[in-house]
């Protein structure tokens, strides 16, 4: 997230290419991208056309989850006279918004972890970014505003609060107060999504890449129970998972990486095939061998499903890194696979 749009659009496709618009709103519980498509579809589509013109792309595909029926209907109406812009329906699983997953779902091309979308003659751009491109060209407006979702353990309930055009630099605390304030005790405040966000503070400023502010339920106290950590490229890194282990008052005794979490030269990890799991039995066996009572996992929808296929049978108690947030936003926990 945050890669400069100007650099992306400097592709100069000579024989045509694709603008792939990521409207998946990949992280669970977020609503601002879909709300903008419902309210300002023309601005988003105008931005898509400008991105096509700048890059030389001759086609565009808007990738959106099929569960968002109202937004899909609005897009279909707006695109009926746009032969070069189509939409593609995505399943409601995480991480359908990962850029290589978008390429795979829209074009049927499986990219290696080290490859960029340009290897598939495509550029992946978020739907909000498309609208900002339209503002920059048509209104000569610099990019200093952000759409985001505030949600969680707030006064007034767990429904999403969508704030549009929030100035970058606004504090986390100010936005939480606009959403009603925190309801009593809570676990942590996360800036970003439940999977890839980081813990933050009330005085921290939002940035151009902030998509959400989430207030979690309090953490369970595991009273020093032994815990294994399963790190997935689609979720929190090892340091984030260690932080959560401590917040649950557990003792780390083992950690493993999903075998698809390929380490990149910069030390980060990317999933070999995002959203498609190879199975997690070997990691669960290691956790069992290391005498873990609990395991905390940061896996995608499919990988979480495979963890659950064997982990509980081995006596392992499974916690997902998003549990404390999913409970706060009234979202199903990531365990067995649900696809819509």
Each model region followed by its residue ranges:
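Iron-sulfur-cluster electron-transfer modules
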Residues: 1-105, 221, 228, 233-262, ...
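Short boundary motifs at domain starts and secondary-structure transition points
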Residues: 8-12, 113, 138-140, 217-223
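Short beta-strand segments
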Residues: 20-22, 151, 298
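Hydrophobic alpha-helical positions that pack around
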Residues: 61-172, 178-185, 193
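Ubiquitin system architectures
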Residues: 181-227, 232-233, 243
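N-terminal glycine-rich "phosphate-gripper" loop used for MgATP/nucleotide binding
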Residues: 296-305
């Amino acid at each position: 997230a945050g890669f400069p749009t100007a650099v992306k659009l400097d592709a100069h496709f000579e024989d045509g290419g694709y603008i792939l618009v990521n409207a998946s709103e990949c992280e669970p519980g977020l609503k601002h991208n879909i709300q903008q498509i419902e309210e300002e579809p023309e601005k988003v589509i105008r931005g898509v056309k400008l991105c096509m013109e700048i890059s030389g792309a001759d086609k565009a595909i808007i990738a959106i989850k099929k569960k968002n029926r109202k937004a899909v209907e609005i897009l279909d109406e707006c695109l009926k006279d746009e032969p070069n812009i189509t939409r593609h329906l995505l399943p409601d699983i995480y991480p359908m918004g990962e850029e290589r997953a978008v390429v795979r779902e829209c074009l049927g091309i499986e990219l290696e972890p080290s490859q960029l979308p340009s290897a598939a003659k495509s550029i992946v751009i978020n739907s909000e970014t498309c609208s900002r491109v339209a503002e920059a060209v048509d209104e000569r407006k610099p990019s200093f505003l952000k759409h985001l979702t505030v949600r969680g353990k707030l006064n007034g309930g767990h429904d999403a609060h969508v704030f549009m055009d929030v100035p970058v630099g606004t504090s986390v605390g100010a936005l939480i107060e606009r959403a009603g304030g925190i309801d009593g005790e809570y676990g942590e405040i996360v800036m970003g999504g439940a999977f890839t966000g980081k813990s933050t503070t009330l005085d921290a400023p939002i940035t151009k890449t902030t998509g959400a502010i989430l207030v979690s339920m309090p953490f369970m106290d595991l009273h020093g129970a032994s815990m294994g950590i399963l790190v997935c490229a689609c979720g929190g890194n090892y340091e984030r998972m260690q932080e959560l282990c401590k917040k649950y008052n557990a003792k780390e005794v083992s950690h493993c990486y999903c075998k698809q979490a390929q380490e990149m030269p910069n030390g980060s990890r990317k999933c070999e095939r995002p959203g498609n799991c190879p199975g997690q039995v070997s990691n669960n066996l290691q956790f069992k061998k290391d005498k873990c009572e609990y395991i905390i996992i940061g896996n995608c929808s499919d990988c979480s499903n495979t963890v659950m296929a064997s982990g509980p049978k081995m006596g392992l108690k499974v916690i997902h890194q998003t549990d404390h947030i999913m409970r706060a936003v009234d979202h199903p926990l990531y365990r067995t696979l649900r696809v819509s």
